[in-house]
Amino acid sequence: MTKFVFVTGGVVSSLGKGIAAASLGAILESRGIKVTMLKLDPYINVDPGTMSPFQHGEVFVTDDGAETDLDLGHYERFISARMGKRNNFTTGQIYETVIKKERRGEYLGKTVQVIPHITDEIKAHVKRGAEGADVAIVEVGGTVGDIESLPFLEAIRQMGIEEGRSNTCFMHLTLLPWIPTAGELKTKPTQHSVKELREIGIQPDILLCRADRAIPEDEKRKIALFTNVPHEAVISVVDADSIYSIPRMLHDQMLDEIVCHKLNLLARAADLSSWNRIVHALKNPKHEVNVAFVGKYVDLTESYKSLTEALIHAGIHNESKVNIHYIDSEEVEKHGTGELEKMDAILVPGGFGKRGTEGKIAAIRYARESKTPYLGICLGMQLAVIEFARNVAGLKDANSTEFDPHTPHPLVGLITEWKNADGKVEQRSEDSDLGGTMRLGAQKCPIVPDTKAFTIYGAEVNERHRHRYEVNNHYVDKLEKAGLVVSARTPTEQLCEMVELPSEVHPWFVACQFHPEFTSNPRTGHPLFNAYIAAALANRKA
C-alpha cells in the first residue's frame, strides 16, 4: 500500500517546496524506499505548454511527452524515478475531466459540485500517479489561503482520513522573515499560516521553516507551542550555496526519521555519500570556464532551469566551476559579438518566435568562425543550420518559415504530418492550436559512426523533444556538400536530429534538435554536456 507525504506552502510563494520535497525523496530513496512524486498545480491552464516563460518559468518535458511544471525537473534530478503525465496535473485538467464525464452522463443527472466531484477527481488522479510506489510525495502548488488551492487542500484533507493517519504525513513549508530594525526572526507569519491550514482541517505533522539564517532553539519551541507541532518536527531550512546540499541539511535534522516514524516505515539507514561527493565537487573545483548563454529570456533564468543545472552537472564531472554569462540576443543584434570574445564556449538554447533570432545567428557565426566550442539546442540547432546555409552554402536570405513565411530558402519549416506518442497521425498548419501540437517526448534515433555525436552517445540517442518546426530535408544534401555533417536522423522521416562540423574545420561544434538537459542529473551528469564543458576547458582563454 502506498503511503503519502503531502507538502504545502504558506506565507509567500517561491519558498522552494519542490526542492524540499525532492530532497526528502532523495533521502528516503537512499534508505531503500521506492519513491515517486506528484505536483498539483491550481491554475486553470490545462498544462504550462502555452504559458509564457516569464509567467511560469521552464516547461519540463517528460519521456511520455507531458509538458509539465519545472518542479518535475527537480524531482528527476533528485530521485531515480522518471516522471510522466500522471505526475503533474492542473485545475484545468481536473475540470476538463469532470465536465467530459458530466457530458457523457456519468453522474446520472446529479448536480456536479466542487465537493464531491472535483475533490474526488483530484483524489483519483493522486492515487493513479502514486501507483507502484512505497511513498508518494505530493506537492500542492500555490500558497495556503489562495482561493485556487482550496479544492486541492480539501482533497488531501479527505485523503488523510480515508488513507489513515499512519499512511499520511502533512509537511508545511513557511517563511520566517528577518526584520533588520528589530534584529530578529518573526514567527507570527508562520503561526498564522498554520492557523489557516488548521481551519481547513489539516494539522501539519512537520514544519519546514525557511530563513536566511539559523533559527534559535527558543524560536523553534515557540513555533512548536503555537502550531501544535512537536519541537523536533520544526525543521530549520536556511539558505544554502547549492540546492544539492539540502538533502544533507534535512537529514542532519532527522526529517527522514520523523517521516518514517509517522508512516510506520522500517528502512535501512540513509546513505548520502553520493550527495556528499556532489557538494564537495561543487565547493572544490580545480578549473573554471566561462560559457556564453545567448537567449531571449535571460532576465528570468528560471526559463532555462534544466539547462542551467545541466551545465552545473557537467562542471561537477569536469571538476570545474561553470560561470554562466547570460547574454540577451537582442543586445547582440544591437552591439555586436564583442562580449563573446572572452568566453570559452557559446550556447544557444531553445525558444520560440522571431525576436532576438538574428542576434543568436550572429553569435553562432562568431562561434563557427572563431572556432569557439558551440552547443545548439532545438532552436539553437535550427539557427546553426540557417547560419551555415547563409554564410557557407551560399543560400542568401535562408530562414525559417516561423520567422519569414516568404523566405526564398525555407531551411526550417513546419512539419505538416507527424505521428504522435500514441501512434496517431496528426495534421498541423500555422493555424493549428498551439497547445499539444508539438513533437513531444522521448524518441530514439541512430547515430552516424565516426562523428562527435557517436563518440558522445554511441550508436543510438534517446532524448526528449519539444518543437513544432524541423530542418527542411530538401536542403540537407546541399548543406552536406558544403561541409555540414548530419550525424543523427529520425529512423522513419529521416529528419535532422543532430548536426556538427568536422574536427578538421572546427574543434567542437555540435547542435541537436532535442533537449538533452531534461535527462541530466548531478550524479552522472549528461554525456553531451560533459563533452561540451570538456571542450570549453580545452579552449580556455588566458
From Swiss-Prot:
Q: Where is the active site?
A: 378 (nucleophile), 515, 517
Which Gene Ontology terms of cellular component type are present? cytosol
Q: Which residues bind ATP?
A: 14-19, 71
UniProt keyword Magnesium present: yes
Q: Which UniProt keywords apply?
A: ATP-binding, Glutamine amidotransferase, Ligase, Magnesium, Metal-binding, Nucleotide-binding, Pyrimidine biosynthesis
Q: Which residues does the annotation say bind L-glutamine?
A: 351, 379-382, 402, 468
- Reaction it catalyzes: UTP + L-glutamine + ATP + H2O = CTP + L-glutamate + ADP + phosphate + 2 H(+); L-glutamine + H2O = L-glutamate + NH4(+); UTP + NH4(+) + ATP = CTP + ADP + phosphate + 2 H(+)
Annotated positions binding CTP = 13, 146-148, 186-191, 222
Q: In which pathway does it act?
A: Pyrimidine metabolism; CTP biosynthesis via de novo pathway; CTP from UDP: step 2/2
Checking CDD domains in the record gives: CTPS_N, GATase1_CTP_Synthase
User: Does this entry carry the keyword Ligase?
Assistant: yes
Instruction: Give the enzyme's EC designation.
Output: 6.3.4.2
One Pfam entry for this protein is GATase
Q: What more does the record tell us? A: CTPSs have evolved a hybrid strategy for distinguishing between UTP and CTP. The overlapping regions of the product feedback inhibitory and substrate sites recognize a common feature in both compounds, the triphosphate moiety. To differentiate isosteric substrate and product pyrimidine rings, an additional pocket far from the expected kinase/ligase catalytic site, specifically recognizes the cytosine and ribose portions of the product inhibitor.
Q: How does it assemble?
A: Homotetramer.
Function noted in UniProt: Catalyzes the ATP-dependent amination of UTP to CTP with either L-glutamine or ammonia as the source of nitrogen. Regulates intracellular CTP levels through interactions with the four ribonucleotide triphosphates.
Q: Which family does it belong to?
A: Belongs to the CTP synthase family.
According to UniProt, the name of this protein is CTP synthase
From the broadest rank down, the organism's phylogenetic lineage runs: Bacteria, Pseudomonadati, Pseudomonadota, Betaproteobacteria, Nitrosomonadales
Encoded by which gene? pyrG
